[in-house]
A protein has these predicted regions:
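Basic, polyanion-binding surface patches
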Residues: 1-182
Length: 182
């Protein structure tokens, strides 16, 4: 999937309202992917994203130690991979190989991009004050890569009970916004 550079200050278009993401990590020569159902944009400049990663998750230690990751945005085409990745542990499985995903090199972090995803956000851990108590990591997006089209990809939104909603239809009210609120 061909990507173009994208301003990291504008990534909220891809992350709100909370799509399922695949978080890739790397540490000591090993890579992993986890499915993440909850993240939040916390600041626009610099672009900060908060993620809750369960302490028992294999990715937790990899990300805590490496202090970086890539937040990858899958579309509906990757629904089965999203579920499969969430149902196994990277401690025993190479998830890139098992789910037929291509690890592409990132430019600012060691963690790989997932080539098949519509967007990839390279992140560095900038605040771990809430990790010990809440497993809450705050990342700064240091590089953003997005597919040239579609502008608004069909993303997955987990509703629980094995059911996803699909984003895709857009309603524009751009003219009604104050410029600084866009």
């Amino acid at each position: 999937m061909k990507k173009r550079d994208f301003p990291v200050s504008q990534i909220r278009r891809y992350l709100e309202p909370g799509p399922i993401v695949l978080v890739s990590s790397a540490f000591e020569g090993k890579t992993n992917i986890m499915t993440l159902g909850w993240q939040t944009v916390m600041e626009f400049t610099p672009s900060l994203v908060g993620c809750m990663i369960a302490g028992g998750n294999h990715s937790f230690e990899m990300i805590r130690r490496s202090r970086e990751c890539v937040i990858n945005l899958p579309t509906t085409k990757l629904t089965d991979q999203v579920v499969g990745i969430g149902n196994c542990s990277g401690a025993t499985v190479d998830k890139f190989a098992k789910f037929g995903l291509a690890a592409a090199p990132a430019t600012h972090v060691q963690a790989p991009l997932i080539a098949e995803c519509a967007a990839n956000f390279e992140c560095r851990l900038v605040d771990d004050a809430m990790v010990r108590k809440y497993n809450f990591f705050i990342f700064e997006v240091v590089k953003a890569h997005v597919a040239a089209s579609p502008k608004y990809p069909q993303t997955l939104h987990y509703t629980g009970d094995g059911v996803f909603m699909v984003a895709g239809k857009t309603i524009s009210r751009r003219a009604k916004f104050r410029p600084e609120m866009l």
